[in-house]
Amino acid sequence: MLNPIVRKFQYGQHTVTLETGMMARQATAAVMVSMDDTAVFVTVVGQKKAKPGQDFFPLTVNYQERTYAAGRIPGSFFRREGRPSEGETLIARLIDRPVRPLFPEGFVNEVQVIATVVSVNPQVNPDIVAMIGASAALSLSGIPFNGPIGAARVGYINDQYVLNPTQDELKESKLDLVVAGTEAAVLMVESEAELLSEDTMLGAVVFGHEQQQVVIQAINDLVKEAGKPRWDWQPEAVNDALNARVAALAESRLSDAYRITDKQERYAQVDVIKSETIEQLIAEDETLDANELGEILHAIEKNVVRSRVLAGEPRIDGREKDMIRGLDVRTGVLPRTHGSALFTRGETQALVTATLGTARDAQVLDELMGERTDSFLFHYNFPPYSVGETGMVGSPKRREIGHGRLAKRGVLAVMPDMDKFPYTVRVVSEITESNGSSSMASVCGASLALMDAGVPIKAAVAGIAMGLVKEGDNYVVLSDILGDEDHLGDMDFKVAGSRDGISALQMDIKIEGITKEIMQVALNQAKGARLHILGVMEQAINAPRGDISEFAPRIHTIKISTDKIKDVIGKGGSVIRALTEETGTTIEIEDDGTVKIAATDGEKAKYAIRRIEEITAEIEVGRIYNGKVTRIVDFGAFVAIGGGKEGLVHISQIADKRVEKVTDYLQMGQEVPVKVLEVDRQGRVRLSIKEATEQSQPAAAPEAPASEQAE
């Protein structure tokens, strides 16, 4: 009854298996993909009919990790998986971006892709496996899809490209690049790098695209054997007469509107033209559909903008193809934050802050691939007012998570190592205005805010978004694209880096036929733009400030013996808790005996260091200490001698005469001088009041308050 069809192939150092026909037979298509022991089950369901009035393509991609895949039970209260994590959201976007452009224009049937990680090898990331699975399932489904696509991860180790490196290899790699594309063209690139050259990055893209051809071939072979018949779907016939009528009413007016340089004014004028045109046409013929008219008007808009660019005319806002919008760069704009900057590029603006915290503030991520700690946090917020709209405000959406991750990639390469700068750093970018490339504005603002905070970043970084308009062999690469140019163009190509190289590259291509030469032109043009922006940024601040903010915690580091760690922590954390409250500092102890004391007040930090040194000091036999009685028992008294240490004064060592009752001589809390007689192998301390008194004050009674004793 169950007749699975299986295809295996070698992919770099891994063996990939594609299997269909075994599970989820009621889905439109389902594939189990495994790479070594990492397995992802991917299903696709497509609706045969579109919803009435549907005017956009409702594609949903869900990626979900099951903890059983790693042999674990979820740690949440309900012991089951909850809403998608940030990592799951990012991988869902990674799957979505290369497949979305391959559905035909006009196809608006609902399609859902669900990728479930069911087994994981900690050395093999499931993201590439899930992308291959989505490509295979869509290709098998019969849904109109111009795939398949392949996907590959490329590393760069010892000046060599590595296909699908393991997690251990990635730690040694200067590059982590994911590339996806069809047999003929690259569609998507997502990467972070340690300031590599444009040629090295382009080489990685080409290498990954070449290597993934084996994936595409394997999927094609599977489709030949197990694929479903392609749906009999045809786009709606073009109504040439209606198109001509709409163009006659609106084309020249839209062309004039797209010469208005102010975004809000332009949008208002375009909306007026559209509504008046639709209103007039429906008045003439009530059978016309407003959605269809809207699509025709959108096509006219697109043609107006694109034809103007291809003809070499000025862009929407009057710029030439390689011009950058006006820049305004300010630092230290918020008085009490640790670091802040306001970066404005045309009608795109980011208010960026940097906050310093201790290692305790780092984020602990309990991921399927294992637990890790992240000491550099980057959060991107895109409120509705940034584009002059109203809307919901709440938890971050997929787009905000994706843009924040891209901006973080852009800055990560220049962040200092924790051993040199032992702070957790959080950067927050508030997009206050947006008209294209707000994620790259966040990179620029983050670099400025980090410098303002005194974070010793290795170099300043800046980001730029490039666009493309291509018709046949004629193409134009645009620098610093507007939102409209992104929406109406063929490519969104974001590059971040320093003067020395690229730290992040993200590319989304909406058409096939983007050649290596076009990517080379875009990278070189982006480099010129990046260097221009860095030049302007350096006029505002050209190096990290010499000291961190007075409002930031200063971290002081001392070293103690590892066998003294338990003394500083105390039973159940009692000593370190009391120290923290007493000194007003934050104290962290590492396994190697490194102690980090964080305080905004230098005197408090010095006091905390002194107290820790007291606690960890070795008890000297024969030395006299000032002590305080902490417990009284029948056979003597326990006396604390500082540093969390306590010793026993036997009843015979209280006075130079026979003592019948300890409480006749000592009271709780009384201060007394004590001499250390012995520290045994178990660390127990034997003390004497009698000898301390005889040595320092022979005639004094032991009840008298002890005075400070010299060594």
UniProtKB/Swiss-Prot annotation:
Superkingdom classification of source = Bacteria
A GO-annotated cellular component:
cytosol
- Cofactor(s) needed by this chain: Mg(2+)
Q: Where is the composition biased (Low complexity)?
A: 694-711
Instruction: State its location(s).
Output: Cytoplasm
Residue ranges of the KH domain? 553-612
Catalytic reaction list: RNA(n+1) + phosphate = RNA(n) + a ribonucleoside 5'-diphosphate
> SMART domains annotated for this entry?
KH, S1
Which PROSITE patterns does the entry mention?
A: KH_TYPE_1 (PS50084), S1 (PS50126)
* Membrane-spanning residues: none
Q: Which InterPro entries match?
A: ExoRNase_PH_dom1 (IPR001247), ExoRNase_PH_dom2 (IPR015847), ExoRNase_PH_dom2_sf (IPR036345), KH_dom (IPR004087), KH_dom_type_1 (IPR004088), KH_dom_type_1_sf (IPR036612), NA-bd_OB-fold (IPR012340), PNPase (IPR012162)
Keyword set, alphabetical order: Cytoplasm, Magnesium, Metal-binding, Nucleotidyltransferase, RNA-binding, Transferase
Q: List the disulfide bonds.
A: none
Q: What region holds the S1 motif domain?
A: 622-690
Q: Where does Mg(2+) bind?
A: D486, D492
> What does the record give as the function of this protein?
Involved in mRNA degradation. Catalyzes the phosphorolysis of single-stranded polyribonucleotides processively in the 3'- to 5'-direction. Involved in decay of speF mRNA.
What is annotated about its quaternary structure and interactions?
A: Component of the RNA degradosome, which is a multiprotein complex involved in RNA processing and mRNA degradation.
Name recorded for this polypeptide = Polyribonucleotide nucleotidyltransferase
| Organism per entry | Salmonella typhimurium (strain SL1344)
